[in-house]
């Protein structure tokens, strides 16, 4: 399925998509 938080966050502390947060695996997931 479509993941609106599909960006990764290895090199940046935040996710750009609204309602998303950086998971422990350095992937943006729904907050």
Swiss-Prot record:
GO biological process: defense response
Protein name: Cyclotide psybry B
Post-translational modifications: This is a cyclic peptide.
Family: Belongs to the cyclotide family.
Alphabetized UniProt keyword annotations: Disulfide bond, Knottin, Plant defense
Function statement: Probably participates in a plant defense mechanism.
Tagged with keyword Disulfide bond: yes
Organism of provenance: Psychotria brachyceras
InterPro entries in the cross-refs: Cyclotide, Cyclotide_sf
Cross-link (Cyclopeptide (Gly-Asn)), chain numbering: 1-31
The organism's place on the tree of life at top rank: Eukaryota
Disulphide-bonded residues: 5-20, 9-22, 15-28
Signal peptide region: none
A Pfam entry, by short name: Cyclotide
Entry's free-text remark on domains: The presence of a 'disulfide through disulfide knot' structurally defines this protein as a knottin.
Transmembrane feature ranges: none
